[in-house]
């Protein structure tokens, strides 16, 4: 049975049991700072389990894309060397949100494994938490698993409830026992059943974990029964495929065999058991799926983890003999294997290939030199040695070797890296200069009251009641005049920062005082915090207030946000469908839009984008918003952003020819935007460009400033504004002509001075020594004069100097017959050190500079004596 069939049978089975099939979420968790990447099927349902989110279904099933590389869950160093470690894997899961519990979960699991997948019952062993008698009885008395194959696992990790069979989301919150199902590969493999001293062997392999969330753990560690217990299960597709396909290692399943052959093809290595080929087969999946989900290689965060994975793959290809980009050529093989289940692979294939090749080309420029340094250090160390941390940092900083790549290579030689010294070197280089924003505080305030109802789509003023107040992150009953704090209301017209749109500002007014709102942020998904300061009087919990949004600021934000949607559509039209939003910031002054594109935009492309957006504005069409089921929105072709987390019902915005999912605030007609102008375009990361633009009155002011500046230049040049460009080109041509003439004159002057200097050359032991200053000579003139003097003097050591703007330029030259004794680099440094400078170069020609021209005469006078000592 193929892996694709196993995946589909799993989903179909649970659909037949009343489960909603939910698409895999992005590998980039949305609004969850605790996760670097999605690493389990339950991630997208976390808020449902915590009670912050509700779904229209109580049963769900998924095949979830997962990555474990970087952060707490990091399998990277083991990938390729073990049978079951991967950076990317698929997690099959079924979930109950307060619906069925242990009995049905266990029955479903057993039915699927033994009746649908037809696994032999005597090959399956299960574990339960030692105190979970309910699960134990279900397995033994209802399912009929022999008691010797139902193993109780207690607290085996050093603390109460610290067990392989007790799952906790965190130190507090939902938790509960779990039951795990193991497959016995047979006596030909070493290892014992779970709970035995030999449990880490390869005989008994866990294939499915069923977590029963039945408690809420408080800060004191007390377990309180949940009113609606839930179920969260996870089964690795790769592991169960290995079992069903009759192989022992995951790399032997159909999914990996095709990729191993692709890796062998691109590296000319026929050994499909090679750990390096396994690394490539694994890493092409992680890299391609991360790129498809919008992650871009970079130097921090998710982008840096992706770059580390790519470079680890390149290094293993290099180890197999690859000396040029090869890794990207495996992408079509992956798309052929998994593109049907995950269409985003095919949709983004061109971008994935281009980005990988760009990363490969960059690393192949430095890997050879880096490997030479690394291997040279390894040769000096014996087994058990310690690799120098400063050298590891040099490899990282100069040659692009991530630390774990160096550690990976050293591990193959049984050598460790001095990570502490590496960290110290890194710390010395970095300057920590991150200043938190004045009001970027208290998004983690403790609040358990009612949610905030948002009315800001239709109203900019609304009567509300104060539910809670915070000062310095602590709940208070009252804020007094001059005090900064956060206000929570039951109703609000203020938009809380989200989706790139900044939070609203304005005021909360009551008979007791005025609170100036300077920012609005989400405390929780549906609770808004109004950040600001009490301007007059007081504000107290329970007060009724008039919440008033700053109308001018909101209107500017709406113009900029609506223009951003039109900009996104125009960029895709002009540059291509590979353009994807990577980030945005919409505030009253401007819009900033980051997008995927591998090269700078031309002036013509910028002009075309502006024209498209302004044409939409002139059309003055009405905008339309609708709340639709996400499946219907997808059918309508609404653009969705990678990494965003969407609910089952979404807000669809139609503006001009653009259709996107968006929860922000927008103009009612495109004409309300007024005017659109791009003010800047540039790169922010590899493969990511940034456009900044202004709208409305800000765009008009920008145009007027540009017109004023152009008028000033036209006046200076004494031409009409329309003729400025041609006149500037003519002036530049004239400047270049004059510069050439000046250089020629300087050369003639220097040459003449050089001829005059010949008589000043001193004869020392048969060689001529000359040290002199040439007035008004630039570097080129000095070099030309040096060549002529060396040619005429035949055997000589010469230093020429020139002074301009308080700085000294030095050139030293030595004829070939003297370089064995007199080095030009040493000679030029002799003089440079005396005038506050330094330099270097070849034995026959060297250059330096200095900042103390007053010391130049004495420095030049020292040349003859120094040369005599060398001869």
UniProtKB/Swiss-Prot annotation:
Which keywords does UniProt give here? Aminoacyl-tRNA synthetase, ATP-binding, Cytoplasm, Ligase, Metal-binding, Nucleotide-binding, Protein biosynthesis, RNA-binding, tRNA-binding, Zinc
Which Gene Ontology terms cover its molecular function? alanine-tRNA ligase activity; aminoacyl-tRNA deacylase activity; ATP binding; tRNA binding; zinc ion binding
Instruction: Specify the enzyme's EC class, one word.
Output: ligase
Task: Tell where it localizes.
Answer: Cytoplasm
Q: Which CDD domains has this protein been placed in? A: AlaRS_core (cd00673)
| Cofactor(s) listed | Zn(2+)
Chief location of this protein?
cytoplasm
Respond yes or no to whether keyword Methyltransferase is given for this record: no
Its GO biological process terms?
alanyl-tRNA aminoacylation; negative regulation of DNA-templated transcription
Q: How is the cofactor bound?
A: Binds 1 zinc ion per subunit.
User: What is the purpose of this protein?
Assistant: Catalyzes the attachment of alanine to tRNA(Ala) in a two-step reaction: alanine is first activated by ATP to form Ala-AMP and then transferred to the acceptor end of tRNA(Ala). Also edits incorrectly charged Ser-tRNA(Ala) and Gly-tRNA(Ala) via its editing domain.
Report the PANTHER family cross-referenced here: ALANINE--TRNA LIGASE, CYTOPLASMIC, ALANYL-TRNA SYNTHETASE
What family does this belong to? Belongs to the class-II aminoacyl-tRNA synthetase family.
NCBIfam families noted in UniProt: alaS
* The name this protein goes by in its record: Alanine--tRNA ligase
């Amino acid at each position: 049975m193929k892996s694709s069939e196993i995946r589909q049978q799993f989903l179909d089975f649970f659909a037949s049991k009343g489960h909603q099939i939910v698409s895999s979420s992005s590998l980039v968790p949305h609004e969850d700072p605790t996760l670097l990447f999605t690493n389990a099927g339950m991630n997208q349902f976390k808020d449902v389990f915590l009670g912050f989110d509700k779904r229209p279904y109580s049963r769900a099933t998924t095949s979830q894309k997962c990555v474990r590389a970087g952060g707490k869950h990091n399998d990277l160093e083991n990938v390729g060397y073990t049978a079951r470690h991967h950076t990317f894997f698929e997690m099959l899961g079924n979930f109950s949100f307060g619906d069925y519990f242990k009995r049905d979960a266990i029955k479903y699991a057993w039915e699927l494994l033994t009746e649908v997948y037809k696994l032999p019952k005597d090959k399956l062993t299960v574990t339960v938490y030692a105190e979970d008698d309910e699960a134990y009885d279900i397995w033994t008395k209802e399912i009929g698993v022999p008691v010797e194959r139902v193993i109780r696992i207690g607290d085996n990790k050093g603390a109460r409830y610290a067990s392989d069979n007790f799952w906790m989301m965190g130190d507090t919150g939902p938790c509960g026992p779990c039951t795990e199902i193991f497959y016995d590969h047979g006596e030909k493999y070493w290892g014992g059943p779970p709970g035995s001293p030999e449990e880490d062997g390869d005989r008994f392999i866990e294939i499915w974990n069923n977590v029963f969330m039945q408690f809420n753990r408080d800060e004191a560690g007390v377990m309180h029964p949940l009113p609606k217990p839930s179920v969260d299960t996870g089964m690795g597709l790769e592991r169960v495929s290995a079992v069903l396909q009759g192989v022992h290692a995951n790399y032997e399943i159909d999914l990996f065999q095709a990729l191993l052959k692709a890796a062998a093809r691109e590296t000319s290595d026929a050994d499909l058991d090679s750990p390096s080929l396994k690394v490539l087969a694994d890493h092409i999946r992680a890299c391609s799926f991360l790129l498809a989900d919008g992650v871009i290689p970079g130097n921090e965060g998710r982008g840096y983890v992706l770059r580390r994975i790519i470079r680890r793959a390149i290094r293993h290809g290099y180890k197999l003999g690859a000396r040029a980009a090869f890794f990207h050529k495996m992408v079509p093989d992956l798309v052929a294997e998994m593109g049907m289940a995950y269409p985003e692979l095919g949709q983004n294939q061109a971008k994935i290939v281009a980005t990988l090749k760009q990363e490969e080309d960059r690393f192949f420029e430095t890997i050879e030199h880096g490997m030479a340094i690394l291997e040279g250090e390894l040769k000096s160390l014996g087994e058990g040695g310690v690799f120098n941390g400063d050298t590891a940092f040099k490899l990282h900083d100069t040659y692009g070797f991530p630390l774990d790549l160096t550690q990976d290579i050293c591990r193959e030689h049984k050598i460790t890296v001095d990570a502490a010294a590496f960290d110290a070197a890194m710390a010395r280089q970095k300057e920590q200069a991150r200043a938190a924003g004045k009001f970027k505080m208290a998004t983690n305030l403790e609040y358990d009251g009612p949610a905030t109802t948002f009315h800001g789509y239709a109203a900019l003023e609304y009567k509300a009641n104060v539910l809670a107040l915070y000062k310095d992150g602590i709940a208070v009953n009252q804020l007094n005049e001059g005090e900064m704090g956060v206000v929570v209301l039951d109703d609000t017209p203020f938009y809380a920062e989200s989706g790139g749109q900044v939070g609203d500002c304005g005021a909360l007014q009551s008979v007791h005082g005025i609170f100036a709102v300077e920012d609005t942020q989400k405390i929780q998904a549906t609770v808004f915090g109004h950040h600001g300061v009490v301007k007059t009087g007081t504000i107290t919990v329970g007060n009724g207030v008039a919440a008033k949004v700053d109308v001018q600021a909101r209107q500017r934000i709406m113009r900029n946000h609506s223009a951003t949607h039109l900009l996104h559509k125009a960029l895709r039209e002009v540059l291509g469908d590979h353009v994807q939003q990577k980030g945005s910031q919409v505030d009253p002054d401007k819009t900033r839009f980051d997008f995927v594109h591998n090269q700078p935009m031309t002036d013509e492309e910028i002009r075309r984008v502006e024209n498209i957006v302004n044409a939409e504005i002139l059309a003055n069409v009405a905008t339309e918003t609708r709340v639709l089921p996400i499946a219907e929105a997808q059918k309508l072709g609404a653009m969705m952003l990678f990494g965003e987390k969407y609910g089952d019902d979404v807000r669809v915005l139609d503006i001009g020819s653009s259709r996107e999912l968006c929860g922000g605030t927008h103009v009612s007609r495109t004409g309300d935007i007024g005017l659109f102008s791009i003010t800047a375009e540039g790169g922010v990361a590899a493969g990511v460009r940034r456009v900044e633009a202004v709208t409305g009155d800000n765009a008009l002011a920008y145009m007027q400033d540009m017109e004023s500046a152009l008028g000033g230049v036209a006046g200076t040049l004494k031409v009409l504004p329309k003729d400025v460009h041609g006149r500037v080109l003519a002036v530049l041509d004239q400047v270049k002509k004059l510069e050439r003439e000046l250089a020629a004159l300087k050369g003639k002057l220097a040459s003449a001075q050089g001829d005059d200097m010949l008589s000043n050359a001193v004869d020392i032991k048969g060689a001529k020594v000359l040290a002199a200053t040439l007035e008004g000579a630039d570097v080129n003139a000095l070099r030309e004069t040096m060549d002529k003097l060396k040619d005429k003097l035949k055997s000589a050591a010469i230093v020429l100097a020139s002074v301009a703007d308080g700085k000294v330029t030095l050139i030293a030259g030595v004829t070939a017959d003297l370089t064995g004794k007199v080095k030009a680099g040493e000679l030029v440094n002799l003089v440079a050190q005396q005038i506050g400078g330094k330099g270097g170069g070849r034995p026959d020609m060297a250059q330096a500079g200095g900042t103390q021209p007053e010391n130049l005469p004495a420095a030049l006078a020292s040349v003859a004596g120094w040369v005599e000592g060398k001869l």
